[in-house]
Design a protein with these regions (language model features):
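Short hydrophobic/aromatic residue motifs in ordered secondary structure
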Residues: 26-28, 107, 200, 295, ...
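Hydrophobic alpha-helical signal/anchor motif
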Residues: 14-17, 24, 31-33
């Protein structure tokens, strides 16, 4: 993935971003794509979806026209046969050698990964946590490759990907990084998911909480809950007699979520796929639901199940407009309407847009 972007001075390039050539026009394209998918797959106009027709930048990305935000807290570098650092060209295995990545967050750039050769490595992923000084590199050796001596410009934990089973193993330092969001610290283990933009987690929590408006004693579901970001946010707002059930399919993410939320005894995390675990819980009703499914969406069967639980509000977090629109149509068939939809540019200079849709029963206006 490497699409060169002419920076304001026309002399520098940003690599590994889709649609870099659109530059300032990128958000307008995101708006057009989202509007098109809502109409085509859900039959919704922006007004019917409660969307103001804008894609909002994250806090800190409101830069002068032509400026490029340094936002990626996680960058996976490709290594060529000579051990040089680069990024893969878009839809290609070819490696474009770079000396810097302008969209890398400062904590990643300060590691100086590009300054070192990485013989016998296939990729080097650099991570800089938000809200802590944790930094990490994850090395993927070529077949039979030996790990190099890692000498970077900042202290860093080192992990490696096993070429046989794909597992991620600690070499030295911590096997996790500590991220901050919503005044809580979240442990994110090796290979675990966390939003790449430094402001994304807080931005999404605010949007979800403003839409759900949790009340004391609410019973809530957090589906595809990851390391517990939304479960933690809801759990802090529903009082001691409230309850949150989180469901997550990733074993390591479940371990992290249980660790992260151990101070909230009203929160329980279950391991497994949502479409398998949820029916087994015996839950027939709840007050709130938040779901942040993978790119393919939740799907018809899961949406049908959720629509039957009578939730007062549902928050749907999506990174793919098409999957969101399909599932919104399923929710409409299940008796729900979209109250509001907000779109955020949490992947600047790429074709991705993050959305938060708030739904409520069509028969109500709460």
């Amino acid at each position: 993935m490497a699409c060169a972007l002419a920076a304001p001075d026309q002399r520098r390039q940003v690599k590994a971003v889709h649609l870099g050539h659109l530059h300032i026009q990128q958000r307008q394209r995101d708006i057009a794509v989202l509007q098109q998918q809502l109409q085509r797959l859900a039959g919704l106009t922006p007004e019917e979806a409660g969307w103001d027709g804008t894609v909002m930048p994250a806090e800190g990305d409101k830069l002068p026209p032509g400026e490029v935000p340094a936002w990626r807290t996680r960058v996976q570098y490709a290594i060529d046969a000579d051990g040089r650092v680069g990024l893969r060209k878009h839809r290609s295995h070819d490696v474009e050698i770079i000396d810097e990545c302008l969209i890398a967050a400062p904590g990643v750039s300060e590691l100086g990964v590009e300054k070192q050769d990485w013989p016998q490595m296939a990729t080097v992923e650099a991570i800089s946590a938000t809200g802590s000084h944790d930094r990490q590199v994850i090395l993927t050796p070529r077949e039979g490759g030996r790990l190099p001596l890692v000498e970077l410009d900042k202290p860093v934990s080192v992990l490696r990907v096993d070429e046989k089973d794909g597992g991620v193993h600690r070499v030295h330092g911590r096997a996790f990084v500590r991220e901050r969001a919503d005044d809580r610290t979240y442990r994110v283990g090796s290979g675990g998911f966390w939003q790449v933009h430094p402001q994304a987690a807080d931005t999404l929590v605010r949007a979800v909480m403003q839409g759900l408006l949790p009340r004391k004693n609410d019973m809530a579901l957090d589906l595809y809950c990851g390391v517990g970001l939304f479960a933690g946010a809801i759990g802090q707002r529903i009082g001691e007699k409230g309850a949150v059930l989180g469901i997550e399919s990733g074993k390591r993410a479940v371990e992290d979520a249980r660790h992260n939320l151990k101070d909230l005894d009203r929160v329980r995390i279950e391991h497994g796929k949502v479409d398998q675990v949820l029916p087994r819980t015996g839950i027939t009703e709840c007050d709130l639901i938040v779901l942040d499914p993978p790119r393919a969406g939740a799907g018809k069967a899961t949406v049908k199940h959720l629509s039957g639980l009578g939730a007062r509000r549902i928050a749907y977090v999506a990174c793919d407009p098409a999957a969101l629109a399909r599932d919104l149509a399923y929710f409409r068939d299940g008796g729900y309407k979209v109250r509001t939809l907000r779109a955020f540019d949490l992947f600047p200079m790429t074709s991705h847009v993050e959305c938060v849709a708030i739904l409520e029963p069509a028969a109500k206006g709460l």
